[in-house]
Amino acid sequence: MFPLIILISFSLASLSETATGAVTNLSACLINHNVHNFSIYPTSRNYFNLLHFSLQNLRFAAPFMPKPTFIILPSSKEELVSTIFCCRKASYEIRVRCGGHSYEGTSYVSFDASPFVIVDLMKLDDVSVDLDSETAWAQGGATIGQIYYAIAKVSDVHAFSAGSGPTVGSGGHISGGGFGLLSRKFGLAADNVVDALLIDADGRLLDRKAMGEDVFWAIRGGGGGNWGIVYAWKIRLLKVPKIVTTCMIYRPGSKQYVAQILEKWQIVTPNLVDDFTLGVLLRPADLPADMKYGNTTPIEIFPQFNALYLGPKTEVLSISNETFPELGVKNDECKEMTWVESALFFSELADVNGNSTGDISRLKERYMDGKGFFKGKTDYVKKPVSMDGMLTFLVELEKNPKGYLVFDPYGGAMDKISDQAIAFPHRKGNLFAIQYLAQWNEEDDYMSDVYMEWIRGFYNTMTPFVSSSPRGAYINYLDMDLGVNMVDDYLLRNASSSSPSSSVDAVERARAWGEMYFLHNYDRLVKAKTQIDPLNVFRHEQSIPPMLGSTQEHKYSSE
């Protein structure tokens, strides 16, 4: 933590020393280029409302956290191009925010020493569906929920494969891959992108052909904030039945009981038919002692099994009871509905029992209620975990009432799509992915260090049971514990093209976590970064560094 504390201090110092002239220059440039929707720290009346609207992890809302000098909300591609031009001209670092769900706050906080701005894409959220071609264009600021809603308005037999959080921005989600309940059937969100419009650091609007296949490959799964700003994605619509089945299955019990179910789950779920996804959310029971131990079988762990099946309830019951009788799925634990209703059912808009208002227009809401403080980490499991290993999971989980685990099953299309098809590499050979989470509220924030140490200790305890050499991680669940390249960015900005050794060092240092996220695809991502953004204009604490080598200074033009 020591280097991070030092860099936070540098960032705060740089903020306090930001020249009034630089602020004036950027403000004037934006206005001269017809960009009028922006707020300035700390004088603009609505600055903090804008900052916090899409700030989803309250760990980064603390007063001592670095603040952007500007928050800019472009509403057209012309304004977006002008925004990039003006920010570069005034020497402001750019952070791009779509939905603000970055696990480490990289879309709205910078620990670099430079003054920075947020380019917020919330005004670029149009979704245009073309059923004839079974495609849609979604602007980079559209949320997943907005995409789902737009599709459902014109078809009840089409869907898109993405995550369950409707307020998550498509720009970041698709850039990192985008796993969801349809991924075993259709692959990731990024697997279903057929074209894109990318605005690079030189203000060029590039489609797939213009950007080239290496860059188009990189923007699908290579992580957000690296390549430029995606103005829009062209996505493939996916055929689904009119009726699907959802299940929420609760099986609270002792650690021994839950471990037995999980031991079977890890074998069954990767081999289910592709139409069937069965994930698990685990949390400590956290019950009063008289309730927890009042029965002969103690309730220590509370598992929630979430199932989506692309077909009728009768088939769900038949398949589950044949392949996984230990779970004992009951008729009243499952419901038939349309696909878009299932998206609402599994979203944060539903209550703990999956109940919702049934109003699918709620999927368009951008603001997320119930924000909290959280820290996440990820792993991939390639070999079945023993009963003792499962018990180890649960013993560690029980230690923290603010902790929980999410198990996402792989197999199906995730096995069939090549690990080099897009930049996201975690494919065949993975049984399931693990997400570790500690989440707390303001009243508990005095315990934040305890929760952070718990999740790091849990992660270390899991080492024998998960992938290795390298240990895998998912870029959409950023984890700064794996390393940061703030020093690398400083070197890159100050290195000359005739002295490439610093860029080589930066690439090699970033390899430590870059290969955890991208495995063997890391070097190709460096190549793509060097091609599209050699001056490292678009960067954050875990972005892909370019190689400098023969790079020449680009002359930026807004024309």
Swiss-Prot record:
Q: Does the keyword Ribonucleoprotein apply?
A: no
What PROSITE patterns does UniProt report for this protein, alphabetically? Answer: FAD_PCMH (PS51387)
GO terms (BP aspect):
alkaloid biosynthetic process; nicotine biosynthetic process; response to jasmonic acid
Q: Which cellular components does GO assign to this protein?
A: plant-type vacuole
Task: Name its co-factor(s).
Answer: FAD
Q: Which residues carry this modification: Pros-8alpha-FAD histidine?
A: H101
Entry's localization field: Vacuole
- What span is annotated as the signal peptide, if there is one? 1-21
Question: In the Enzyme Commission scheme, what number(s) does this protein have?
Answer: 1.1.1.-
Residues in coiled coil: none
The induction comment states: By jasmonic acid (MeJA).
Instruction: Show the disulfide pairing.
Output: C29-C86
Which body tissues produce this protein?
A: Mostly expressed in roots.
Give the glycosylated residues: N25, N37, N321, N355, N494
| GO MF | FAD binding; oxidoreductase activity
What is this protein's function? Involved in the biosynthesis of pyridine alkaloid natural products, leading mainly to the production of anabasine, anatabine, nicotine and nornicotine, effective deterrents against herbivores with antiparasitic and pesticide properties (neurotoxins); nornicotine serves as the precursor in the synthesis of the carcinogen compound N'-nitrosonornicotine (NNN). Catalyzes a late oxidation step subsequent to the pyridine ring condensation reaction in the biosynthesis of alkaloids.
Family per similarity comment: Belongs to the oxygen-dependent FAD-linked oxidoreductase family.
Q: What is this protein called?
A: Berberine bridge enzyme-like A
Gene that encodes the chain: BBLA
